[in-house]
Amino acid sequence: MRLWFCLSLFIVLCLEHFPGTLADERNVPESEEKTEQFLRDLPKINRKGPRPPGFSPFRGKFHSQTLRDLPKINRKGPRPPGFSPFRGKFHSQTLRDLPKINRKGPRPPGFSPFRGKFHSQSLRDLPKINRKGPRPPGFSPFRGKFHSQSHV
């Protein structure tokens, strides 16, 4: 890392001492004149010719059409049932159907939307789990170097 830093610093210092490089361009008003000329020419550059239909500087699914055509794209037809712009477990159904999904039926015992060691049982069953029986000696719910022994 230090080698790259020293090398890049050395190159910059060398470039500043040669004529016609960074040191000269920094203080020369010609570069400002070029910038002003470029800004004056920008409207001409933009008006060179009309863009072809369907052209967009953006790339993507909805950018092959111009921005004016976006409302037409949205109104092309009704979306199929179950369509959602989001992808995921709960987005295969529309947002209106989410309450129906939740009310479909009772969840199976042990089901939980969370995954993990303590989530295989539902939250209602946690007190029962804790009261099932005495913990074996040396048991700790924590895992680690100092948790293999029980605290007395």
Curated annotation (Swiss-Prot):
<dbReference type="GO" id="GO:0090729">
    <property type="term" value="F:toxin activity"/>
</dbReference>
<dbReference type="Pfam" id="PF06753">
    <property type="entry name" value="Bradykinin"/>
</dbReference>
<keyword id="KW-1213">G-protein coupled receptor impairing toxin</keyword>
<feature type="signal peptide">
    <location>
        <begin position="1"/>
        <end position="23"/>
    </location>
</feature>
<dbReference type="GO" id="GO:0006952">
    <property type="term" value="P:defense response"/>
</dbReference>
<keyword id="KW-0878">Amphibian defense peptide</keyword>
<keyword id="KW-0840">Vasodilator</keyword>
<dbReference type="GO" id="GO:0042311">
    <property type="term" value="P:vasodilation"/>
</dbReference>
<keyword id="KW-1222">Bradykinin receptor impairing toxin</keyword>
<feature type="region of interest" description="Disordered">
    <location>
        <begin position="28"/>
        <end position="152"/>
    </location>
</feature>
<feature type="compositionally biased region" description="Basic and acidic residues">
    <location>
        <begin position="28"/>
        <end position="44"/>
    </location>
</feature>
<keyword id="KW-0964">Secreted</keyword>
<keyword id="KW-0732">Signal</keyword>
<comment type="function">
    <text>Potent vasodilator. Binds B1 (BDKRB1) and B2 (BDKRB2) bradykinin receptors.</text>
</comment>
<dbReference type="GO" id="GO:0005576">
    <property type="term" value="C:extracellular region"/>
</dbReference>
<dbReference type="GO" id="GO:0005179">
    <property type="term" value="F:hormone activity"/>
</dbReference>
<keyword id="KW-0800">Toxin</keyword>
<protein>
    <recommendedName>
        <fullName>Kininogen-1c</fullName>
    </recommendedName>
</protein>
<dbReference type="InterPro" id="IPR009608">
    <property type="entry name" value="Bradykinin"/>
</dbReference>
<comment type="similarity">
    <text>Belongs to the bradykinin-related peptide family.</text>
</comment>
<keyword id="KW-0677">Repeat</keyword>
<keyword id="KW-0838">Vasoactive</keyword>
